[in-house]
Amino acid sequence: MKKRMLSFVLALALCLTLLPTALAAGNASFSGGSGTAEDPYQISTAEDMFALAEAVNQDKVSYEGSYFRLTKDIDLGNIHWTPIGNNASREGRQFLGSFDGGGYTISGLEVDVDSGYVGLFGVVGLSVRDSGAEVKNLRVEGKVSAARTSSF
């Protein structure tokens, strides 16, 4: 009985410890919207773009089935950019949502990485068949360079 109670308490403690992390992962802040096709997340600032990149790359939120819409031109200010989705071999580090640029432009993109995952988006729907992942109606201006090295 004591072992069963201890197991229960430890399991509860683990769940309570992980709960804030799980809640924070899905709470990236955007300029509006709920992420549905009818009410997509609104991306209108460089901060929104950085929040999306951080959620996918750090919090491992893929946004599968979620919708985004760019609402105006954005200048990323030539600040070093880490592509949205940066490692296809790790679950959750790829973008699986739908990003509609609305015909707007994201300028000032500057990417300089040591991998093959380069651009505004590094990995979009690579490992999930029929995920619906897409990036459309978007113009991107900036500089992208990649130095892929091998130890073979």
Locate the predicted segments by residue:
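Positively charged n-region of N-terminal signal peptides that target proteins for export
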Residues: M1-L10
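Bacterial N-terminal signal peptides
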Residues: A11-T17, T21
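Surface-exposed repetitive/solenoidal architectures
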Residues: L23-F152
